[in-house]
Every structure is written in structure tokens, then in C-alpha cells.
Amino acid sequence: LTAGCYSQTDWKSFMSRQDMTWTRLPQTWYEAPFMGNGSMGSYICKEPGKNAIRVDVGNSMVHDHRTDDASIYGRGRLLIGYFLLHPVGEIKSGDLRLDLWNAETTGCIRTTRGAIKLRACVTSESPYILVETEATAGEKEFTWKFYPENTDSPRQLNAIRKGNKNHLKKDYVSNPAPQLSARNGLNLCWQILLAGG
């Protein structure tokens, strides 16, 4: 006995009707389009308080390796950092689309000097976040800059930020600060962890 099902659904067209769209730029991470491959992840939003677009870098495999710490502070996933796209002009508006069929985010940032189109994705089998841009003449000189995050436990950082002494681990030893360098024309960020990894 065999059973089968045949569908004439145009899946690309069907999926495009499910795409999420933003008619204004997301103002924070929880409004942003998220992309990922199960390990590597990213989101895109306007950086709060700055004239810049944030492309976050995250990876669930980046975590602390403190075996002498059985608490939730010793093995937590660590923040990596983010890129900021700094336009030439002042950001006035923008739009984004999370394309489900192609697993990518596309959009346009409009400024007082022109526009920057972008297309971003997280590759499915490799740990890469790809961002392609195309700028009008007035925005050709926009820049990218990487900003590393603090490599301490996010729980510890959150307790410090909120001034919550009940959740502050008193004997927590901070990881060294990230080191930025350049080699062979590539910009690098080295994040050393006390317990390795």
C-alpha cells in the first residue's frame, strides 16, 4: 500500500506572503528581524541613541568553560559583539523585510545624504554572517566598525547593570577585555577566557 500527496502550491509565492516587514527601522533588539542557523545568529536594528545600524553577532557555542563553578555563572553563553554601520548622513527612515523563503533580511536605510540598501543572512552550514550593501553616491563613504562585548557572564553583567546585589556573584573573576588587532588586512577580535575555550 502506498500513499502520496501532490500539491501545486507555489511555495516561494506562498512563503513571501508570510514575510515579516518593517515600515520603520526597529529601534531595539526585541523589535528586530532575527536570522540564524541553529548556532550562529544575528539581528538588525537602529542602534539606540546613535546614528547607526546594528548587526549583532551571536553564537550559542560561545560560552564560558569554568568547571570549578557549578552555578549558572560558570557555563553561561557569552556575548560576542556587534557591527555598526555608520552612514555619512543622518538616518531619516528605513524599511526591512525578513524573507522566509531565502532566509535573509533585506532593506533600505534612507539618510539626509542618500540611501543604503542591505541584504543579510546567516549561512546554513558555516559560521558566517554575510551583509551586502549598495549605497547611493552620497552614502558611498559609510563605514563599518566592530564593537566587542564584555566577555563576562551575562547574568553577572545584568546584576551589575541593574545594581541587583542579590544576583551579583561576589567571587566572580572577570575574563580579560577583548583585544582588537589587524593582520594581513583583516581586523580581528581576540576574546580570551580565563577557563579557555
Language-model features, listed with the residues they occupy:
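Aromatic-residue-lined binding/catalytic grooves and analogous aromatic/hydrophobic interfacial grooves
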Residues: Y6-G197
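Hydrophobic h-region of N-terminal signal peptides that target proteins for export
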Residues: L1-C5
